C-alpha cells in the first residue's frame, strides 16, 4: 500500500535516495580530507623532529637576533655621537652628554636584569660550561633570562664602553636552542632528550652564538668546543657546521639588505698583500707578540679576579654597594666616562673612537710612523696627537683600556670580555709592528727581494694571541682569519697563539674558569698528564662513607627526619638499613611529595569525617566546639605570622628552602603541628574547615604522629632504578673520565651490591687539586695508607716466594 502511495505521489522516494547518496558522498569527502589532513600533520610532525629543521630554524632566529642587536647598537652609538657633536663648542654640555648618555643606558640595563632575571648578568659562558658538564643551574635557560639578556646586552652595547658581545650572545643562543627544542618536542609529541643530547643541543647553540656574532662559522664550532666542552661528540660536528654556516650567511645577508655592507665580506675587511704575506725574518717579532700577549692575558685575568674578590669582601663600601645595587655600575660608568672624555684626558689615548672603529683603524694598511699628514687617514687620525709620539699614544691606550676593560666587565650587566681583549691585543700587535717599521724603514731583504713591513698584520696577530691567552683557546686564530679574510697569516697566528697559551696557562686559569672558581660553581678540573700521583688514588680513598639513605621500610617520620637533617637533592634507596643493598635513587622533590600527600589538611578531611561518624558527635557539640576552635586557630595563626617554624610538612618546606636549624620549641606541644600552618599557608582552611573544626588540637597532633609511624608505600613515586655505580677500586683517572663523558654530578660506590659510599664532583675536585702545605701537594690520607698496606703485602709475597725457592 505504501509502495503504491509512493508511486502515486511521484518522486519523493527517488529524492530521498538522492539525498542519502549526497550525504554519503559528503561524508566520504570529509573522511578523505581528514585522512589527508592527518597524513600531512604526521608528515609535518615528523619533519619538525628532524635535526636539520631544528638547526635551520635556530640559525635563522639567532642571525635575526644578532643582526637586530648590532643594528640597534650601531644606531645608538650614532645617536650618541650626534648628540655630542650637537653641543660642540660648549665643554660643559659636551661633558654632560658624554657622561649621562652611557650612565642612563648602563643603569637601565642593570635595573632591567635585576628585575626580570638576575641570572642574565655577566658573560654566561662559565655557567654554560658547568651546565654542559652535568650541573643543574636553575633559571639560566629560561625565557625570562633570554629577554633580560637580549635587552640588557643591546642597551649596554649602545653605551660605547669596552664591553663585549660574544659571551652573552653564546648564552642567548643556548637559551634559544633549549626553548626551541622544547617547542618542537611539544609539537611533535616526543619526549625531551636525555642529558647527553641536551648537552649536544647546548654545544650547537654555543657554536651558532659565535658564528652569527662574528660571521665565522668554522671558528664558531671550534671555539665552542674548546671553551665549553671537555669532550665533544663527533656526531655534533655536522650540526654545528650546518647551523653555523646558515646563521652566518643570514647574518651577513641582513647586513647587505640594510646596506651596511656592499656584499658578503668579512666583518673587518683587510687588504694585506697576498702573494708573500710575511717573511721568515718576521717570525721572531710574531713570537715576541705571542709571549707578551701570554703575560698580559694572565695579568688581565688576575686583575679581573682581584676586582671581583675585593667587591665580595665584607667592608663598609661593599655593604653599601650590596644594599644599593645601582651604585656600583653608576660609579664605574661615571669614572670611565670621565676619563674617556675626548676634550679631556681621553684625547691622549684615542677615547673618541668606538670599539669597531678602533679595530678598523688598527687593521689599516698605513704605517703611522711614516705618515706626515694624518688628515687623510679617516678614523686613524684620532691616534695622532700634536706634540705627542704615536708610541706614547698607543701605550697610553693599552694601559688605560687594560684596567678599564677589567673593571667594566665586572658591572652587573650582560657583557663579555672578548672584544675589549681583542682591541688590547690589536694595539699591542700594532705597537710591535710600528716599532719594526721604525727599525727597518726600508723593509726586510730576503733572497734579493724587498718586503715592506705592514703594522696592520701585526695587529691582527696580536688580537688573536691576546684573546687566546685570556680564553685559553687556540681557535681564536681561526676567528681572526675569518674576521679579516686573511687566511694567508694562519702560520704566524698559530705560532703567536700557541706561545701565548703556553705562557698564560702556566700563570693563570682562563677567564671563564676564574669566574667559575670565584662563583664556586660545580666544575671538574682537568687531570693533567704530569699529575702522576693522582693515578694512584682510588674512589675508596675519597668517597663519603657516612651516607644518608632511605630504606624501603622507612616510615613517614623517617622521611621527615631525613629532609630535616640533610640538604641533598637525591637520596640512595636501599632495601633495609641492615643489608643496605642499593635499589635506586629518589629525588628530594619526590620525597617531599610523599609527605605532602600523606600529612596535609586534605588528607585529614576523611580522617576527621570518619572519626566524627565513629564517635557520633551531634550538631550541638560540634557547634559549641566550632567557636572554640576558631579562637584557637586565630591564636595559632597569629603565632605563625610571627615566623615560628612548625613541625610536620612545614618543617619540610623550611628545611628545603632555608637550611637553618629547626626551632628549639618542644615538638610535644600540640600547637606545634604542621596541618594548622598548612591551613593558613596553602588556603585549605576554606575547603576543610567543616571537618577540621571536628578535631581538637590534641587529636590533630595524635593523627599526625600516627601517620608518621606508617610505613611508606614507594610505589606512588618515581625511583631511578639504575643510578650510576662505581666500586671502591676504581681509579681517579677513570672516574674523572666517566664524570666528564656522562656529565655526572654524583655516583654511588657499592661492594657486592651493598652501598658503602658516594662520590660527587666536590670529592673529585678536592682530590685533583689536592691540599697544599709549604709547597708540597699531599695525597688523601687513605691513599697513603693503602699504598703502605700494598707495599707490605707485596713485601710478604716476595719473601714467601724467595723462601719457597
UniProtKB/Swiss-Prot annotation:
Residues 606-625, 653-684 are annotated as: Disordered. Residues 125-132, 201-213, 217-225, 456-470, 471-472, 473-484, 485-489 dip into the membrane without crossing it. The CLC channel family contains both chloride channels and proton-coupled anion transporters that exchange chloride or another anion for protons. The absence of conserved gating glutamate residues is typical for family members that function as channels. Signal peptide: none annotated. The keyword Glycoprotein applies. One of its GO terms (cellular component) is chloride channel complex. Its main location: membrane. It is found in: Membrane. CDD domains: CBS_pair_voltage-gated_CLC_euk_bac (cd04591), ClC_1_like (cd03683). It is a multi-pass membrane protein. Belongs to the chloride channel (TC 2.A.49) family. ClC-0 subfamily. A motif (Selectivity filter part_1) lies at residues 122-126. Voltage-gated chloride channel. This channel is thought to ensure the high conductance of the non-innervated membrane of the electrocyte necessary for efficient current generation caused by sodium influx through the acetylcholine receptor at the innervated membrane. Chloride binds at residues 123, 418, 512. Keywords: CBS domain, Chloride, Chloride channel, Glycoprotein, Ion channel, Ion transport, Membrane, Repeat, Transmembrane, Transmembrane helix, Transport, Voltage-gated channel. A motif (Selectivity filter part_2) lies at residues 164-168. Residues 543-601, 719-776 form the CBS domain. A motif (Selectivity filter part_3) lies at residues 416-420. GO terms for molecular function: voltage-gated chloride channel activity. Residues 1-48, 508-805 are cytoplasmic. The chain crosses the membrane at residues 49-86, 93-116, 141-159, 166-184, 237-256, 283-311, 320-339, 388-408, 416-439, 490-507. Glycans are attached at residue 365. This is Chloride channel protein. It comes from the Eukaryota. Homodimer. Each subunit contains a channel ('Double barreled channel').
